[in-house]
Amino acid sequence: MSKLTIPGTVGPIEIALDGELTSPRGVVLLAHPHPLFGGTMDNKVVTTLMRTFVQLGYLVVRSNFRGVGQTAGEHTAGPGETDDLLTVLDHIWHMDAGRYATLPFVLAGFSFGSFVQSHVAVRLAAQGKHPQRMVLVGTATSRWEVAPVPADTLVVHGELDDTVPLQSTLDWARPQSLPVVVVPGADHFFHGKLPTLKQIVLQAWAGQA
């Protein structure tokens, strides 16, 4: 892992790079849970996803949202965080003479981070750019206006989530005819269920080149 800061619109953004730098199969942009409730890029769900995508051969990019770690600024409940993730992705695309710009990219997030990634996808789509896939875990559908997502998005939610009730995510997914993978017995933070979460992602990628 390497950590560094890059220029953002309101000051530095702290990012971490994990995995394959030389010849990755793609780039994963990974977003953490709500910063005002202790969310950081070192959250256990986030690091589980990071390790899973590293195992799959990706370059994984995490960043701290505004006001967390070495990232400047104050929490904006979505708009500024969306801008910052787009800044991070653009920075990665311009690294090493643009070697990563032509690779597939994945947008992944947990809780508040999933909400932000849904809006990152909308902004990118307006530029004609589309992720290889999205992975949204414990999506904060009961607390923020989560945008519609592509039909192949992997949505994972805990059966016993009392932070974001499963029903709210089902209600969000239903009009989109979007499947939701429910982990029996899992709470919002997937305590004791992180290996299951990892296997769900690995299985979703099984057979992909």
Where are these regions (language model features)?
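Short beta-strand/loop motif that positions the catalytic acidic residue
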Residues: V149, L154-H157, D161
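Catalytic histidine-centered segment of alpha/beta-hydrolase-like enzymes
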Residues: A186-K198
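Short alpha-helix in the alpha/beta-hydrolase fold that links the catalytic acid
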Residues: V149-A151, P165-A173
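Serine-hydrolase catalytic machinery in alpha/beta-hydrolase-like enzymes
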Residues: I6-G8, P12-Y100
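Primarily recognizes the serine-hydrolase "nucleophile elbow" in alpha/beta-hydrolase
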Residues: L85-A151
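Acidic catalytic loop of the alpha/beta-hydrolase fold
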Residues: E159-V164, H188-F189
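Short glycine-rich catalytic loops that host catalytic nucleophiles or stabilize transition states
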Residues: R66, V181-D187
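A domain-start/cap signature at the N-terminus of enzymes
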Residues: M1-T5
